């Protein structure tokens, strides 16, 4: 319990085998920060009485106000057991879903994690999410079941009921672990199948054998949580106690005389003790006996709580005496039972010992990093470890060794950048004065006092001052000198204050190999850096990076300026950090944006990107209240973008500065940081910018009152379609199937385009494979430019063919025949969920194979102008006709592309120009040089036949094609049934039974839809799973807490896009619809409301009347 010195921590850092890098993960309000407080108090950093109340790791003011953790923060703890001393680098992480990106940054630099579960609420949605993140990062978890006291105090469980409840929680979390394990085994099996297909020498029948043994032959016993394995601890962090069954096994082995190993296996499970025979028997439930866990452990804890809550002083004294504890008189006389329980239990079952002992025994050290995790960190999804150059593959051994030799390469990963006040840095903190400085200050103060007395009496001192000048006797002469001295002493202070107000950025990092020393030169590798690119540009055999190295993309070179030991709110200065430790690095703000890999060798690949569970979806536009402060806002947004791993900063085409965040709480934190820390100005924030998507659907079969569309309605629908088509300008042909035929303004090219809705499964496949589509586009563009920078890997090729196979599987039927092979492009931004299909007979081009024929001049001409067609498609999918939002789930089919008139016009124009050139060159007796120049110009024009786009009064022909293709796509959309797509949240709500009706009322009011409702066994808690439009989510959490008096708390995570069923352009046609919806039907049409709101925000035309029948709004006659 003694506060450790910095020297002690530096000494512990050098023993890599005894380092444990761990993070605490849990659902919100399950007790992570309280548990961290208890562990911190064991080192004497805070008082044990303040544990759970101080929330030491929550250093932000808004964290203390809201009572939730918003950022990951680290602290180093010392733990001694027996002859071993351990250094625990503990990282506390948030549990709120808005800050799940902070969990990702913490998990990446850890080797193990503590999963905290509330004993009452059990496994919650965010528990599943953090366990999945730990699994993806290949780190080992241990389990802490917290808040056991709630089972006693709140739910009034008996020990037997509590045991059954705890068993259910363990079963739930082990079932989740089993699901993750099964998916991993099946993925590995699928990879082996793919390799066996590539390798023809594989034995037949192996696939069937793998199917039956993939799960059976894999040992998964070490993955599951079980108290007998020692990876589960039962705690009450607020009361300061916790235990593993090893503690009681050691005690009862001495009392009962049964071996400790036997008790370790039987204290948890269906075992009971036969006291007469002193034997442990199996089958407690069948024989109606109490399990050992209930009889020997839970009943003792229950009896203690019962005695304290009932204030049975005699029983309390008896328990304290039997346990050999010493309780202070203050705690014994205290009226609050919690104080007495804490005083007794923290001595009897100290939580810090139970948790830290489990961490040291069950979680790995940095030396135990697995080869699988190393390869996963180094390889992105499109690369395999074998595809790296030999220099890169050799680094795997350095990862595994985690050596501190001078020859070992230094490898550091920066998971995030965080901002601290410059005054909080160790070098800027005030230090204690030395004796000499104190004496000098005393002498100067005495001298100033003597001068003031002399000035007041009008007498000069006999001795001169230190600088040799005599002090004037006149008080008036003294005043200017005194003022001058005052100005000199006060001048530096504003400058210092201004410097101290600046934010300094610290890199949150971990050393994986080598020793990080202050001043060491190192490469900074961005997420997109490629070691192959470096080795291609830099000659072999270079030793140190000289200044003459060529520019390599996404790589910089800098020195490690300052190294810090992270101690929660404090930072300690370090000269060097051995491998395996977590540290802070100063001076990287100009080189690292959010995350980066630091390495002394440029052959190191960047670590794979972090896995973010939450997608940024909430957008607001910000601007300064005073326009002159725009530079401060821009600078502040840059700093905010660097300080937050999840936030996105965008500048739209309109010039708006847009902030994209993960949710309302995250948005509020970002705005507070912008106003108070980074920009320090007053800002105006717009209403949330709701994202929508536009799409088309099949014609409906039922009307708005759920009746089958009859003849009268079909006539009305046809009439409505004709009205829609009448809005299309003249000269554009529309057939009955929605085929749009349009010509360019100069009438030289004709395009025929049709729009079709994609099946929902295909849209989902396109969304899931957007990164793969982007890689395909980069590969295609590099090949077209004659470069070979993007070498395709075998794994990527397999993914591409798998992606194509999925599309072929879902695009079946007469309409979609052979359409996958004819896909020309994806959009928007060439990787979106829309497809351009080329069915033109004159020119065949596919995204899978490229242009079919590059040799013929005609195909070359089509290929050159094809980029204009694709650009028009990209523009059309980027902004739809309804409210200029991106399209989703639409297939545009280019049925015809006629360039015959363009070729004729080009040939005739070229002939005329050639004739004029001939006449000019042969028309007179010019000298030979002029004739040579004319012939060269003619040859140049001739060589560009069919390749140079014609330019006329309508502009370049390529630009006309872009605009025409864009208009064709928009008109093809408008002749189909259009729909809006809304972004949807998955909403998980935990509520008690008595407020369930209010929860449903709030959900229905906000257009929510309940998907599932289940009751937590043994409690009165319900878990409601619903979907809620993002547009209706603002203020939802506050409203539901108000309506339920804080008994329900929602967790909102972006899930998917969903089509709004109502047609935004629908008008009533039948009598039933007129009666139900009224003449205008604008009050019930949710899609129209959303569409008009977006159009108003963007300044587009909105078809609505502001005032109608104004005389009805006036009182024309006075009532007497």
Curated annotation (Swiss-Prot):
A GO biological process held by the record: cytosolic ribosome assembly
Mutation effect (residue 33 to A): Loss of GTPase activity. Abolishes dissociation of EIF6 from 60S pre-ribosome subunits
Enzyme nomenclature, EC number: 3.6.5.-
Gene Ontology, cellular component aspect: cytosol; ribonucleoprotein complex
Domain tr-type G, chain residue ranges per copy: 17-272
Region (Disordered): 430-496, 907-930
Biased composition (Polar residues): 920-930
Record field: catalytic activity: GTP + H2O = GDP + phosphate + H(+)
Keyword rRNA-binding assigned: no
PTM annotation (N6-acetyllysine): residues: 528
Pfam family, one: EFG_C
Alphabetical UniProt keywords: Acetylation, Disease variant, Elongation factor, GTP-binding, Hydrolase, Nucleotide-binding, Protein biosynthesis, Ribosome biogenesis
GO MF assignments: GTP binding; GTPase activity; ribosome binding; translation elongation factor activity
Tissue specificity statement from the Swiss-Prot or TrEMBL entry: Expressed at low levels in brain. Expression is highly increased in glioma tissues.
Consequence of substituting residue 1095 to Q: In SDS2; uncertain significance
Listed PROSITE patterns: G_TR_2
Matches recorded under NCBIfam families: small_GTP (TIGR00231)
Designated name of the protein: Elongation factor-like GTPase 1
């Amino acid at each position: 319990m003694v506060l450790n010195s910095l020297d002690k921590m530096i000494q512990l850092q050098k023993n890599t085998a005894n380092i444990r890098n761990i993070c605490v993960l849990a659902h919100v309000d399950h007790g992570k920060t309280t548990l961290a407080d208890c562990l911190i108090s064991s080192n004497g950093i805070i008082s044990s009485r303040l544990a759970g109340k101080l929330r030491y790791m929550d250093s932000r003011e808004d964290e203390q106000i809201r009572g939730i953790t918003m950022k990951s923060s680290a602290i180093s703890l010392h733990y001694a057991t027996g002859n071993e001393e351990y250094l625990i680098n503990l990282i506390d992480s948030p549990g709120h879903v808005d800050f799940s990106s902070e969990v990702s940054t913490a998990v990446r630099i850890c080797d193990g994690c503590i999963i905290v579960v509330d004993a009452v609420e059990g496994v919650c949605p965010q528990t599943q999410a953090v366990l999945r993140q730990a699994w993806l990062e290949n780190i080992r978890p241990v389990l802490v079941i917290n808040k056991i006291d709630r089972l006693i105090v709140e739910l009034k469980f008996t020990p037997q009921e509590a045991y059954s409840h705890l068993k259910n929680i363990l079963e739930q979390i082990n079932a989740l672990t089993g699901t993750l394990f099964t998916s991993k085994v099946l993925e590995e099996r699928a990879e082996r199948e793919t390799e066996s297909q590539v390798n023809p020498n594989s034995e037949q029948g192996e696939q069937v054998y793998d199917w039956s043994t993939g799960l059976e032959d894999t040992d998964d016993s070490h993955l599951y949580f079980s108290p007998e394995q020692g990876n589960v601890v039962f705690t009450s962090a607020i009361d300061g106690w916790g235990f593993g069954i090893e503690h009681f096994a050691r005690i009862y082995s001495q009392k009962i005389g049964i071996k400790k190993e036997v008790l370790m296996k039987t204290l948890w499970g269906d075992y009971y003790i036969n006291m007469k025979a002193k034997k442990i028997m199996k089958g407690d439930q069948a024989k109606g006996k109490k399990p050992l866990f209930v009889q020997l452990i839970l009943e003792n804890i229950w009896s203690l709580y019962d005695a304290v809550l009932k204030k049975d002083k005699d029983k309390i004294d008896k328990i304290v005496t039997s346990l050999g504890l010493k309780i202070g008189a203050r705690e014994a006389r205290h009226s609050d039972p919690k104080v007495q329980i804490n005083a007794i239990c923290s001595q009897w079952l100290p939580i810090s010992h139970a948790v830290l002992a489990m961490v040291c025994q069950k979680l790995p050290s940095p030396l135990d990093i697995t080869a699988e995790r190393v390869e996963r960190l180094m390889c992105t999804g499109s690369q395999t470890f074998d595809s790296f150059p030999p220099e890169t593959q050799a680094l795997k051994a350095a990862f595994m060794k985690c050596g501190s030799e001078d020859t070992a390469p230094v490898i550091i990963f920066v998971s995030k950048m965080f901002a601290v006040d410059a005054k909080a840095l160790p070098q800027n903190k005030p230090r204690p004065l030395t004796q000499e400085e104190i004496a000098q200050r005393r002498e100067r103060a005495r001298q100033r006092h003597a001068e003031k007395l002399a000035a007041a009496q009008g007498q000069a001192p006999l001795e001169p001052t230190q600088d040799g000048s005599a002090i004037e006797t006149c008080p008036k002469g003294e005043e200017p000198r005194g003022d001058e001295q005052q100005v000199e002493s006060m001048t530096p202070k504003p400058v210092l204050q201004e410097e101290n107000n600046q934010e300094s950025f610290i890199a949150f990092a971990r050393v994986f190999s080598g020793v990080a020393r202050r001043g060491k030169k190192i490469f900074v590798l961005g997420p997109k850096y490629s070691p192959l690119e470096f080795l291609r540009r830099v000659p072999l055999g270079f030793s140190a990076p000289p200044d003459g190295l060529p520019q390599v993309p996404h790589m910089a070179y800098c020195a490690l300026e300052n190294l810090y030991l992270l101690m929660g709110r404090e930072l300690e200065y370090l000269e060097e950090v051995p491998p395996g430790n977590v540290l802070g690095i100063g001076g990287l703000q100009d080189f690292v944006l959010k995350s980066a890999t630091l390495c002394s060798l440029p052959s190191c690949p960047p670590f794979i990107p972090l896995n973010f569970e939450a997608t940024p979806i909430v957008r607001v536009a910000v601007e300064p209240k005073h326009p002159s402060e725009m530079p401060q806002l821009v600078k502040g947004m840059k700093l905010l973008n660097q300080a937050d791993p999840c936030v996105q900063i965008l500048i739209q085409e309109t010039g708006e500065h847009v902030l994209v965040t993960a949710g309302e709480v995250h948005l509020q934190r970002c705005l507070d940081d912008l106003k108070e820390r980074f920009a320090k100005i007053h800002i105006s924030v717009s209403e949330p910018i709701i994202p929508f998507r536009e799409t088309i659907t099949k014609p409906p079969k039922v009307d708005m009152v759920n009746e089958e569309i009859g003849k009268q309605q079909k006539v009305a629908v046809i009439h409505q379609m004709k009205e829609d088509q009448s809005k299309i300008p003249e000269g554009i042909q529309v057939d009955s199937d929605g085929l749009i035929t349009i010509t360019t303004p100069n009438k030289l090219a004709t395009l025929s385009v049709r729009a079709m809705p994609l099946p929902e499964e295909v849209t989902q496949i396109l969304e899931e494979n957007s990164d793969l589509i982007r890689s395909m586009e980069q590969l295609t563009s590099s090949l077209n430019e004659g470069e070979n920078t993007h070498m395709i890997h075998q794994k990527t090729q397999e993914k591409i063919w798998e992606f194509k196979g999925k599309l072929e599987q879902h695009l079946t039927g007469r309409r979609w025949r052979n359409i996958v092979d004819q896909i020309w492009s994806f959009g928007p931004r060439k990787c979106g969920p829309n497809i351009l299909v080329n069915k033109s007979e004159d020119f065949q081009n596919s995204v899978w194979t490229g242009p079919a024929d590059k040799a013929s001049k005609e195909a070359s001409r089509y290929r050159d102008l094809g980029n204009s067609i694709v650009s028009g498609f990209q523009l059309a999918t980027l902004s739809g006709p309804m409210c200029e939002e991106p399209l989703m789930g639409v297939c545009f089919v280019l049925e015809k592309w006629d360039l015959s008139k363009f070729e004729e016009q080009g040939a005739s124009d070229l002939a005329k120009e050639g004739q004029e050139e001939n006449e000019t060159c042969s028309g007179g007796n010019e000298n030979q040089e002029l004739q040579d120049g004319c012939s060269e110009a003619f040859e140049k024009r001739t060589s560009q036949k069919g390749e140079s786009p014609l330019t006329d009064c309508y502009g370049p022909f390529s630009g006309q094609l872009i605009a025409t293709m864009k208009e064709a796509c928009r008109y093809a959309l408008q002749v189909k049934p259009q729909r809006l797509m809304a972004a949807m949240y998955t909403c998980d709500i935990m509520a008690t039974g008595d407020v369930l009706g209010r929860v449903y009322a709030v959900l229905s009011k906000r257009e929510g839809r309940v998907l599932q409702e289940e009751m937590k066994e043994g409690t009165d808690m319900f878990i409601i799973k619903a979907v809620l439009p993002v547009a209706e989510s603002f203020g939802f959490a506050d409203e539901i807490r108000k309506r339920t008096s804080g008994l329900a708390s929602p967790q909102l995570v972006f899930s998917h896009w969903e089509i709004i069923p109502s047609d935004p352009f629908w008008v009533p046609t039948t009598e039933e619809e007129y009666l139900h919806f009224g003449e205008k039907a604008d009050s019930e049409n949710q899609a129209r409301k959303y569409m008009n709101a977006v159009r108003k925000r963007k300044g587009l035309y909105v078809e609505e009347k502001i005032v109608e029948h104004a005389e009805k709004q006036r009182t024309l006659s006075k009532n007497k």
